[in-house]
Amino acid sequence: MDLFEYQAKELFAKHEVPTSAGRVTDTVAGAREIAEEIGKPVMVKAQVKVGGRGKAGGVKYSADADAAQANAEAILGLDIKGHVVKKLLVAEASDIAEEYYISFLLDRTNRTYLAMCSVEGGVEIEVTAEENPDALAKIPVDAVKGVDLAFARSIAEAGKLPAEVLDAAAVTIQKLWEVFINEDALLVEVNPLVRTPDDQILALDGKVTLDENAAFRQPGHEAFEDKDATDPLELKAKENDLNYVKLDGEVGIIGNGAGLVMSTLDVVAYAGEKHGGVKPANFLDIGGGASAEVMANGLDVILNDAQVKSVFVNVFGGITACDAVANGIVGALKTLGDEANKPLVVRLDGNNVEEGRRILAEAAHPLVTVVGTMDEAADKAAELAFAAK
């Protein structure tokens, strides 16, 4: 989960990372009020989860409250690379002597953590890495030893930060490591990490990506979720503990097991080439259990997608036998009632498949078509979706 800058700075404050004073607002009047409270020049900064805000006019220096108000009016509602600005961070402007770069992230290739540091901050780090790779130090971090002050200082030295700020930078780097580890982050990045004229070190910007798989041990992270930006279907699926990803096609997919669902996406995409180019509408893995409740929740999500024209239920019975799956489908259709209004193509295989097919045949629901093989089912689902377009 990517955080807004103001949310990243909330985590920074929690771990005593030095940064500039400020607050977030979603109104022009609020921006003026914050600027008046600070009583000094401020930066009015668009809160969007995308880079290039400054070049797009989303970051403005404001000498006083009047300027902050005018800049807030200009920035709120601005479209920055497809992201509409709905919130602003109004923060005290800082005197900057130099700009640096620091980040912690996962090094998936070497299966460890990585620190990156550079004396050249304030620009896109990809540019630095491409044009002047020697200026970007990459330092592996031992997952057991972590980052103490001495190691944090060595990171700053590797990044060629000036000697007179190494101690102050080390303190900040060590605290950023605490954010990275204690908050279960996948990325903590500060660009720029600035040196003020009196040799203070401040994190003027912040980018944090949290590991959503660690949410169970980070209950406070739920407050960071941007529900306004989350697709409502994905939000509904998450509330029901369903593994769901919305795609842009017309054939809804339900399966048990990620591998089977991925294979189903492939066969539907292939079948769709013969039926007007229809494509899978989603990834939805209901896991090992296919109770009536789980199936109903899955169908409820998919059937509420206006793009979906047909649904392909592809289940291989293992620990959960096919008769239980079939009962789940029948129960789900009863639960949904009139909301179940799109054709379902069901393919069952595996444990107790004959009984599962018998249950579906006996129920004789007018929207359900039972098909023997995955290829045949994909073809039928694609055909029905194309006919309904």
From Swiss-Prot:
Its EC number is 6.2.1.5. It is an enzyme of class 6 (ligase). One of its GO terms (biological process) is succinyl-CoA metabolic process. Keywords: ATP-binding, Ligase, Magnesium, Metal-binding, Nucleotide-binding, Tricarboxylic acid cycle. Substrate binds at residues 256, 318-320. Mg(2+) binds at residues 191, 205. Succinyl-CoA synthetase functions in the citric acid cycle (TCA), coupling the hydrolysis of succinyl-CoA to the synthesis of either ATP or GTP and thus represents the only step of substrate-level phosphorylation in the TCA. The beta subunit provides nucleotide specificity of the enzyme and binds the substrate succinate, while the binding sites for coenzyme A and phosphate are found in the alpha subunit. NCBIfam families: PRK00696.1, sucCoAbeta. This is Succinate--CoA ligase [ADP-forming] subunit beta.
